[in-house]
Amino acid sequence: MIKTLAKQIKEYKSASLVTPIFMILEVAMEMVIPLLMASIIDDGVQAGDMKHIFAIGCYMILAAIVGLFAGVMGGKYGAKASTGFARNLREAMYENIQTFSFSNIDKFSTAGLVTRMTTDVTNIQNAYQMLLRMCFRAPVSLICAMLMAFLINARVASIYLVAVVFLGIVIIFIM
């Protein structure tokens, strides 16, 4: 079944591959901003260095703009890939329905076929978009947050690491 669905991605493979890249960039920018804020407080405010505050503030604005751009582009390409995937899937279903014999047409109701081509495909489309966006965003967020925690304070981050491993084990047993 997955092979059948994967065939419908066709010309949307590039959009499907670009979406996670933009999501990774967006998450990286989201994780850099608190680190820059810490630098402003630790090195700028406490020392009274206005040049440092201004410079790091400019980097924060740049990181926010890059993160916003990456988020918008990730959303755009994710939507393009998922809607194109759904369109191809509906087209393939329609072509398959056209080959039905009269006995098959009598077996499936028109309402059932319409539901399959609309609601079910829309659900698959939404699942594909969530796969493109969230299945990459969550692990990358975890990795970037862990990295930032170790950059700030490795001793405290080790507690975070133990908690993440514990939660991972619990989640595996729940599933």
Task: Give the location of each predicted region.
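Alpha-helical transmembrane segments of multi-pass membrane proteins
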Residues: A15-S16, A63-S82, R133-V140, L161-M175
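Short intracellular "coupling" helices and adjacent cytoplasmic loop segments at the cytosolic face
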Residues: A47, T83, E91-T115, T119-V121
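Hydrophobic alpha-helical transmembrane segments of ABC transporter permease domains
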Residues: I21, L25, M29, I33, ...
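Short helix-capping/hinge motifs at transmembrane helix termini and TM-loop junctions
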Residues: Q46-A47, G75, S82, S101, ...
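Hydrophobic alpha-helix/TM-entry signal in multi-pass membrane transporters
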Residues: T4, A15-P20, I56-M60, F108, ...
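Transmembrane helix-loop-helix hairpins at lipid-water interfaces of multipass membrane proteins
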Residues: K10, S16-M73, Y77, F150-R155
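A short amphipathic helical element positioned immediately N-terminal to and/or at the very start
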Residues: M1-S16, L113-M117
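Alpha-helical transmembrane segments of polytopic integral membrane proteins
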Residues: P34-A38, G75, R90-Y94, A111, ...
